[in-house]
Amino acid sequence: APPGFTPFRIA
């Protein structure tokens, strides 16, 4: 996964 990737959306 790319750097800063998260499985959740950050608002």
Swiss-Prot record:
Tree of life domain: Eukaryota
Similarity comment: Belongs to the bradykinin-related peptide family.
GO biological process, one term: vasodilation
Source lineage: Eukaryota, Metazoa, Chordata, Craniata, Vertebrata
GO CC annotations on file: extracellular region
Location of this chain's protein in the cell: Secreted
Gene Ontology MF annotations: toxin activity
Protein task: Produces in vitro relaxation of rat arterial smooth muscle and constriction of intestinal smooth muscle. May target bradykinin receptors (BDKRB).
Keywords per UniProt: Amphibian defense peptide, G-protein coupled receptor impairing toxin, Secreted, Toxin, Vasoactive, Vasodilator
Expressing tissues: Expressed by the skin glands.
Name of protein: [Ala1,Thr6,Ala11]-phyllokinin
